[in-house]
């Protein structure tokens, strides 16, 4: 049994109401419920955590190492483009991770084109809406079974 951690950054708690033309109509709770069921169907466990505070996400990454988390799925939200601290935390715990974005950040404003995580992520999935989370979990399951 593998243990997965889904991390969501700032403003993702507003999913379902925030700019649905960009982010879709599903709530974060619905996405998390779907992923927990998907993990369970494969005999695994998925925990989720969302915060608008950078330090809380960093602390959750640190705790993941002590808890034996095998793989992290992360939608860092706006911290994608700003957070060296989150990058350093992920590198520090050496847990493989996939970066997920609901929208295609490269089709949006230029300031969203830079990611501090993509070059150290195991993979990046973007622009596929909530389905991107499910695809990321499928990939993480495959990669943990392979190792």
UniProtKB/Swiss-Prot annotation:
Residues that coordinate or bind substrate: 75, 81, 88, 102-103, 112
Assigned EC number: 4.2.1.10
Alphabetized Pfam families for the sequence: DHquinase_II
SUPFAM superfamilies: Type II 3-dehydroquinate dehydratase
Entry's Gene Ontology molecular function annotations: 3-dehydroquinate dehydratase activity
InterPro entries: DHquinase_II (IPR001874), DHquinase_II_CS (IPR018509), DHquinase_II_sf (IPR036441)
Active site: 23, 101
Pathway the protein acts in: Metabolic intermediate biosynthesis; chorismate biosynthesis; chorismate from D-erythrose 4-phosphate and phosphoenolpyruvate: step 3/7
Classification via PROSITE patterns: DEHYDROQUINASE_II (PS01029)
Acetylation recorded as keyword: no
Site note Transition state stabilizer, residues: 18
Class of enzymatic activity (EC top level): lyase
Keywords: Amino-acid biosynthesis, Aromatic amino acid biosynthesis, Lyase
Gene Ontology biological-process annotations: amino acid biosynthetic process; aromatic amino acid family biosynthetic process; chorismate biosynthetic process; quinate catabolic process
Assigned protein family: Belongs to the type-II 3-dehydroquinase family.
Subunit structure and binding partners: Homododecamer.
Protein name: 3-dehydroquinate dehydratase
């Amino acid at each position: 049994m593998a243990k997965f951690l889904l991390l969501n950054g700032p403003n993702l708690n507003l999913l379902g109401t925030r700019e649905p033309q960009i982010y879709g109509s599903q709530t974060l709770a619905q996405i998390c419920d779907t992923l927990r069921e998907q993990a369970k169907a494969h005999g695994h466990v998925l925990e989720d955590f969302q915060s608008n505070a950078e330090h809380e996400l960093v602390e959750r990454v640190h705790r993941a190492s002590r808890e034996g988390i095998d793989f992290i799925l992360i939608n860092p939200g706006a911290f994608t483009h700003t957070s060296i601290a989150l990058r350093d935390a992920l590198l520090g715990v050496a847990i493989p991770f996939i970066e997920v974005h609901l929208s295609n950040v490269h089709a949006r404003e230029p300031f969203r084109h830079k990611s501090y995580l993509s070059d150290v992520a195991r993979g990046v999935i973007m622009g596929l809406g909530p389905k991107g989370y499910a695809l990321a979990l499928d990939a993480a399951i495959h990669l943990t079974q392979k190792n």
